[in-house]
């Protein structure tokens, strides 16, 4: 499957944190994705861009915090992350660019 331009709209960037690194040891990868992206869209995009087989996709939405900017209250943007579990034998090196 070849990657289409809309696949790059679904997957924004890889998430590199301590928890994401621990997930990679269990054959998983974490991506920041578009808020309106669905699990089937995320699965299709990952399989097309990285040429791997996806076993499961779990998503989480983090609500933006209320913070003060120059003394006035403001709200940070909401974020959606996708925890992608890969089939055995498939790997993704997130240190290389998308």
Curated annotation (Swiss-Prot):
Pfam families: Ribosomal_L23 (PF00276)
Keywords, ordered alphabetically: Ribonucleoprotein, Ribosomal protein, RNA-binding, rRNA-binding
One Gene Ontology MF term: structural constituent of ribosome
Top-level taxon in the UniProt lineage: Bacteria
GO terms under biological process: translation
Matches recorded under InterPro entries: Nucleotide-bd_a/b_plait_sf, Ribosomal_uL23-like, Ribosomal_uL23/eL15/eS24_sf
The keyword Cytoplasm appears for this protein: no
GO cellular component, as recorded: ribonucleoprotein complex; ribosome
Family: Belongs to the universal ribosomal protein uL23 family.
Protein function: One of the early assembly proteins it binds 23S rRNA. One of the proteins that surrounds the polypeptide exit tunnel on the outside of the ribosome. Forms the main docking site for trigger factor binding to the ribosome.
Subunit structure: Part of the 50S ribosomal subunit. Contacts protein L29, and trigger factor when it is bound to the ribosome.
Protein name (database record): Large ribosomal subunit protein uL23
Organism: Cereibacter sphaeroides (strain ATCC 17025 / ATH 2.4.3)
Lineage: Bacteria, Pseudomonadati, Pseudomonadota, Alphaproteobacteria, Rhodobacterales
């Amino acid at each position: 499957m070849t990657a289409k331009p809309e696949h790059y709209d679904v997957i924004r960037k890889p998430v590199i944190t301590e928890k994401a690194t621990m997930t990679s040891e269990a054959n998983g990868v974490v991506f920041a994705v578009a808020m309106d992206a669905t699990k089937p869209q995320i699965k299709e995009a990952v399989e097309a861009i990285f040429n791997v087989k996806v076993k499961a996709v779990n998503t989480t939405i983090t609500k933006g915090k209320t913070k003060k900017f120059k003394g006035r209250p403001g709200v940070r943007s909401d974020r959606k992350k996708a925890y992608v579990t890969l089939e055995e034998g498939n790997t993704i090196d997130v240190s290389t660019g998308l």
